[in-house]
Amino acid sequence: MQGKIIKSLAGFYYVESEGQVYQTRARGNFRKRGETPYVGDIVDFSAEDNSEGYILAIHPRKNSLVRPPIVNIDQAVVIMSAKEPEFNSNLLDRFLILLEHKAIHPVVYISKMDLLDSPEEIKAIGRQYQAIGYNFVTSLEELLPLLADKITVFMGQTGVGKSTLLNRIAPELALETGEISDSLGRGRHTTRAVSFYNTHGGKIADTPGFSSLDYDIANAEDLNEAFPELRRLSHKCKFRSCTHTHEPKCAVKAALETGELWPVRYEHYLQFLSEIENRRETYKKVIKRK
């Protein structure tokens, strides 16, 4: 039989197949090979009834996230708050390049719009992201149609209202929500386990909130690919390996001068590129010491 793991708990994997859910375990040979089934995996399994079965094989994965481990994701809703905590375009772009690199379609959702005196600044930022090609939504009514026929994860900085949003989407989840800490200005982590839930014509999963992200982009070429607007322009650069920093006849810098490119995103690209180069230098020093 073939199915999808929709929940992992205490060594059991709950596999959905043809409308039924089977409780399974992974055979010992997975552990010997260093393989672990994850929520989202397509698996072959055997089961005589719903109470007990065994996973026999794991199909190849199209993508994965590691905190917590979840695989084969169609899209990710990145939740950013308009206020408390303040909207942070740098953090948003870190989420976006991670998702682009993982081939996961991003959707940007802005929470707490009601706390703003005027929504115009956020809406203006939204128009910039929409011009790049991203879905940028500020209401539940805009978000819900995007969930149909997709496996969707939700991510965002702690305290942005992720559990609150999920409870509005699927009240049966009854997820615990955390208040913002006055001393730190951050929310408490309130989500723990990961499961898929059927709702609004698709499947949704919860992931813990993050205040920072580590991305595994290792070079300028991969970083360029993670910025759609740079990716579209870079083939016009004189040099194929152009980093869009100092090279002559750079199409990205030309677009920046004409106003075609949003300066905020270019600044973030330069910052992330610098971080990648610094990590590479640190790694070289460590290797030399060995």
From Swiss-Prot:
Record's cofactor remark: Binds 1 zinc ion per subunit.
Quote the cellular component terms of the Gene Ontology held in the record.
cytoplasm
Q: Which PROSITE patterns match?
A: ENGC_GTPASE (PS50936), G_CP (PS51721)
Q: Name one Pfam family in it.
A: RsgA_GTPase
**Protein's UniProt name:** Small ribosomal subunit biogenesis GTPase RsgA
One biological process GO term for this chain? ribosomal small subunit biogenesis
What is the top EC class of this enzyme, as a single word? hydrolase
Main site of residence?
cytoplasm
Protein keywords: Cytoplasm, GTP-binding, Hydrolase, Metal-binding, Nucleotide-binding, Ribosome biogenesis, RNA-binding, rRNA-binding, Zinc
Disulfide bond: present as a keyword of the record? no
Q: Which cofactor does it need?
A: Zn(2+)
Q: Can you tell me which family this protein belongs to?
A: Belongs to the TRAFAC class YlqF/YawG GTPase family. RsgA subfamily.
User: Where in the cell does this protein reside?
Assistant: Cytoplasm
Q: Which Gene3D superfamilies match?
A: Nucleic acid-binding proteins (2.40.50.140), P-loop containing nucleotide triphosphate hydrolases (3.40.50.300), Probable gtpase engc, domain 3 (1.10.40.50)
Report the function annotation for this chain: One of several proteins that assist in the late maturation steps of the functional core of the 30S ribosomal subunit. Helps release RbfA from mature subunits. May play a role in the assembly of ribosomal proteins into the subunit. Circularly permuted GTPase that catalyzes slow GTP hydrolysis, GTPase activity is stimulated by the 30S ribosomal subunit.
Cite the record's note on assembly. Answer: Monomer. Associates with 30S ribosomal subunit, binds 16S rRNA.
- Give the EC number(s) under which this enzyme is classified: 3.6.1.-
Please tell me where Zn(2+) binds in this chain: 237, 242, 244, 250
* Domain (CP-type G) ranges: 62-213
List of residues binding GTP: 111-114, 156-164
Q: Which GO terms describe its molecular function?
A: GTP binding; GTPase activity; metal ion binding; rRNA binding
